[in-house]
A protein has these predicted regions:
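Primarily membrane-embedded glycan-assembly and transfer machineries that use lipid-linked glycans
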Residues: 1-220, 224-226, 248-377, 447-453, ...
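Aromatic-enriched
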Residues: 2, 72, 391-494
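Hydrophobic cores of alpha-helical transmembrane segments in multi-pass inner/ER membrane proteins
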Residues: 8-18, 335, 384-389, 456-473
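A cytosolic-side transmembrane-helix exit/cap motif
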Residues: 227-231, 278-284, 401-407
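Central hydrophobic cores of alpha-helical transmembrane segments
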Residues: 231, 260-266, 361-366, 406-418
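Transmembrane helices and adjacent periplasmic/lumenal helix-loop junctions
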Residues: 231-248, 372-379
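Membrane-embedded alpha-helical segments of transport systems
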Residues: 236-238, 266-270, 419-423
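Hydrophobic/aromatic-rich transmembrane helices and adjacent perimembrane loops
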Residues: 376-393
């Protein structure tokens, strides 16, 4: 809860002043002057409702308090993380792996890694093995030069810089110079739970998300060398980045793919050399480590509530029938991939199989990366492009289209699903509720497991479907706009 003491009062005041100063439409105000969307009776009623003094005050107060609470929480989190022995749980794996690499020992060997983990971190017992690919070793090599606490501090600073790059990249992709929309974009991206959670545990998901985001920015400008290097580096966590290699192959951006493959291959062999490993030995150790890693309760689809991917939906619904559970998850994923493939075919056929890349495609591939592969809470940072897409879609509707209740319902479904992945709902509400049970011991009631605690997984599915529907609808709208002299389009065919 927010403490309304002296310092918190100052923070609340500063946040309110900053938001007020930036809550301006600027160029958008003139662009919206003749908007058919805003002239709709439904929108006019909403505008009148929110213009009521009490409603306007409550909305503004709510935004100020949420932003203030978030800033206070993040500030205290950063402070505690820079103290001796902070709870950066995931970071410890990277640190131990780096230390072993400096000794030319293999972190992929289960016995060596477990013993070193106990020695370096003083945490012993069952330790999940290091299941990352060897191309991550050169990227975390520098950690081994520092003590544990110094490396902690450096890692936190790197995360803060990465969050800054994520916010910057999101604003680059936003199709508005309005301060109000840029403020909304910045707040919405910052509230994604994965950003805070990644900072809290010291994972690498934020780095991968930033590399993917800037890869798209560079690729859109046909700077394939920079984009390829970003993709090659992002493949240190292949569950989040591997689908983009396939995507660029389908887009025939072969130079970008070639550079990414050269980058990741160089890192792989360098990582193997640093750990005195051969490829066959690595594959043997990785296979054994992966089988042990699957026994971790935080990974099990039947126990874990931290997983976001759709592969846990079936096992949660049918815990006593593994075959049916896996079949259901596979079917959901197959249908989702098929629908995304259909959209891609429509997009390519309308653009003459162009090599140009689109934000909707980036968002859908990002969503699929979370949905079809093993994904934890930190992976929700991959939803940053989804925030920008939904804002850009709203801007497009206001500028060029008439109001459609069906389309706005889909848009609102996407926004509400994205809200589930924020620190407010996923981080504070759902996680706080989970503390009432011993989740790892399997004490969570079935009805809770398939409803409230499954919301993040359902939200990933809903976000993907919503954006897919909006993207297909936009294709039709833009086709009509080509033949509409007044640059207005009706959604009657939607």
């Amino acid at each position: 809860m927010i403490s309304f003491g002296f310092w918190n009062l100052i923070i609340v005041t500063l946040v309110a002043l900053v938001l007020k100063n930036n809550w301006r439409l600027d160029d958008e105000k003139a662009a919206w002057k003749n908007s058919l969307f805003l002239k709709s009776s439904v929108i006019q009623q909403l505008i009148q409702f929110f213009r009521q003094p009490i409603v306007n005050f409550l909305v503004q107060a709510g935004v100020v308090l949420v932003v203030t609470r978030f800033l206070c929480y993040t500030g205290w989190l950063i402070y505690f993380l820079t103290q001796p022995n902070p709870p950066l749980w995931d970071f410890r794996w990277y640190y131990v792996a780096s230390k072993l690499a400096h000794q030319h020992l293999s972190p992929f060997n289960v016995e060596i890694f477990t013993q070193s983990f106990c020695t370096l971190t003083k945490i012993c017992g069952f330790i999940p093995p290091f299941v990352y690919p060897p191309n991550i070793i050169p990227l975390i090599w520098f950690l081994g030069y520092f003590s544990l606490n110094t490396a902690f501090t450096i890692w936190v600073v790197m995360h803060i810089l990465a969050i800054g790059l994520a916010l910057w990249g999101a604003n680059i992709l936003l199709k508005s110079k309005s301060r109000a929309f840029r403020t909304i974009c910045t707040i919405s991206v910052a509230l994604i739970y994965g950003l805070v959670r990644d900072l809290q545990v010291g994972n690498v998901a934020i780095f991968v998300a930033v590399l993917i985001l800037w890869m798209f920015i560079f690729a859109r400008k046909h700077q394939d060398i920079l984009a390829g290097v970003c993709l090659g580096l992002a493949l240190c966590k292949p569950t989040l980045a591997a689908l983009f290699v396939l995507y660029f192959l389908l887009k025939r951006r072969f130079s970008l793919v070639f550079i990414s493959i050269v980058t990741v291959t160089s890192l792989v062999f360098l990582g193997l050399a640093l750990t005195s490993n051969s490829l066959t030995q690595f594959l043997s150790d990785a296979s054994r480590g992966f089988s042990l890693w699957l026994n971790d309760p935080s990974v099990s689809p039947y126990i874990s509530i931290s997983r976001l991917d759709l592969m846990v939906v079936g096992p949660r619904l049918f815990p006593n029938n593994p075959f049916v559970g896996k079949l259901l998850s596979d079917l959901i994923v197959l249908i989702l991939v098929g629908l995304v493939g259909w959209y891609w075919y429509l997009q390519q056929s309308l653009t003459g199989w162009s090599k140009k890349i689109y934000l909707a495609e980036l968002v859908l591939v990002s969503c699929l990366s979370i949905a079809i592969n093993y994904s934890q809470e930190t992976s929700s940072v991959m939803l940053i492009p989804a925030v920008v897409f939904l804002l850009n879609d709203l801007l497009y509707q206001i500028r060029y289209c008439t109001f459609s209740m069906k389309r706005m319902s889909v848009w609102l479904a996407g926004v509400c699903s994205l809200a589930v992945q924020t620190a407010v709902i996923h981080g504070w509400l759902i996680q706080s509720l989970a503390n009432h049970w011993n989740v790892k011991a399997g004490e969570l009631p079935y009805i809770m497991k398939v409803t409230i605690f499954a919301l993040p997984s359902y939200a990933i599915l809903a976000i993907t479907v919503s954006i897919l529907v909006l993207a297909i609808s936009s294709l039709r709208q833009k086709q009509v706009l080509k033949f509409e002299p007044l640059n207005r389009v009706s959604n009657k065919n939607y």
